[in-house]
Amino acid sequence: MIYSEIIKRGSKFLKKNKIKNPYLDTELILSKVTNKKREEILLNINNKLNNIDLLKFQNYLIRRYRKEPIAYILGYKYFWKHKFLINKSVLIPRPDTELLIDETLKYLPIDKSKRILDVGTGSGCIVVSLLKERPKCTATAIDISKKAINVAKTNAKLHQLENKINFINIDIDKYKSYN
């Protein structure tokens, strides 16, 4: 089946279940399956998808049809100015949380070395975004979930900040006495 037909059928399928952005989500899923940017897919709209990839596409589409968030299906979410890997072990970074970055940056002078504490780090998107903006700073990021810490460590490494963040798998109440 060619890309244009896949997009047409996929978006129609998602629209039946009142998925908010059926066309975009279908394109994003096709992009994941083909490992191509959306623009490249649209420029090659008559390319065919092989049967194995078509099955993968259909499985992802069914997950989206069942209202699984597109970010969990894709395995990433953009936050602030960066791409963060995510999975079901962490919450999906929300656009309104970017306000926290804006406000925090007002209190972190660009030329000063400060220490940041990120409690409940999850994907690490907040601490990584802050350190990208304030390279002289360092941080400690804590989370009760070992799986979340692993996701955050992966994101720190992805953004080449693994040496600037001390990750601790601990409950906040225990951290007080730990520190």
PLM ranges: what are they?
Residues 98-179:
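Conserved SAM/SAH cofactor-binding pocket of Class I
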Residues 28, 77, 169-171:
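A general secondary-structure junction signal
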Residues 32-107:
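Conserved AdoMet
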Residues 1-57:
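A short N-terminal interaction module
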Residues 7, 26-27, 57, 67-70, ...:
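A general structural signal for well-ordered alpha-helical segments in protein cores
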Residues 19, 89-90, 131, 145:
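Short beta->alpha junction loops/turns
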